[in-house]
């Protein structure tokens, strides 16, 4: 491909190599990148192009681009979304890929860790020690006045008549839950 750039004095010819189509069609290695509140760290979801059953949440120090923490998820599960809950802590939501569904679905499980990988633990869902069986959970809000907690909505879709959505105050360090309110009718959002 030949590109030309014109200036007021001369015309220059710039040559560029063709970019292979495979580069545009390939699955991305890094899918979602978010900067920490103090802009010290980057967190990103990483998908291994050689092993589609492996996904990671990776934290990098912006100053030297060294990896400071990794959270691994294997099999059909992966970290579908994550956010910086405060200056040091990241919360990730787990989703599952099932062959017969077009889109992955969230399992309701949440994992949290510090920027350095310390204090990594399941804080909500079936994987949490003594956790509840939920089929849906989503983050409603981070709480700037309470940096150790987030507000989530949770549902258990296994109930035949539908479920009551609960708003839960969730401690992002130990997974303690406190129900704030419950929807007055089933299947409310």
Regions found by a protein language model. Name each.
Residues 3-189:
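Beta-propeller folds
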